Swiss-Prot record:
GO terms for cellular component: cell cortex; cytoskeleton. Binds to actin and affects the structure of the cytoskeleton. At high concentrations, profilin prevents the polymerization of actin, whereas it enhances it at low concentrations. By binding to PIP2, it inhibits the formation of IP3 and DG. This is Profilin-1. PROSITE patterns: PROFILIN. It holds the Pfam family Profilin. The keyword Magnesium does not apply. Occurs in many kinds of cells as a complex with monomeric actin in a 1:1 ratio. Disulfide bonds: none annotated. Keywords: Actin-binding, Allergen, Cytoplasm, Cytoskeleton. It comes from Hevea brasiliensis (Para rubber tree). Belongs to the profilin family.
Length: 131
């Protein structure tokens, strides 16, 4: 299965009538493996900052998580595994695997829990596959 297929079928899938706004699988070095057509153009520094928070949880809390120029308030995640951010009625979930970051961006009517489930389910699967 190609990385683009994972994005199209596993991340941009329908859940209770809702879809993520955008999604991507990005290498820990910031290289794009696959992304939805509307995934925001991000800066390498933004991915570096996200990776730093996985290495040292809490580093993003004071400044927020920035992705594609959008600032998200960091909310409770799982240290070293998941970072969650919120902005107004939407937000972002980032799941770290051995080699990649799985990123899902959502907006209402999708709920944070639905986004978390989609992103973390794929992340867990890839970890089980040694990715």
């Amino acid at each position: 299965m190609s990385w683009q297929t994972y994005v199209d079928e596993r991340l941009m899938c329908e859940i209770e009538g809702n879809h993520l706004t955008a999604a991507a699988i990005i290498g820990q070095d910031g290289s794009v493996w696959a992304q939805s057509s509307n995934f925001p153009q991000f800066k390498s520094e933004e991915i570096t900052a996200i990776m730093s928070d996985f290495d040292e949880p809490g580093t993003l809390a004071p400044t927020g998580l920035h992705l594609g120029g959008t600032k998200y308030m960091v909310i409770q995640g799982e240290a070293g595994a998941v970072i969650r951010g919120k902005k107004g009625p939407g937000g972002v979930t980032v799941r770290k695997t051995n080699q990649a970051l799985i990123i899902g961006i959502y907006d209402e009517p999708m709920t944070p829990g639905q986004c978390n489930m989609i992103v973390e389910r794929l992340g867990d699967y890839l970890l089980e596959q040694g990715m």
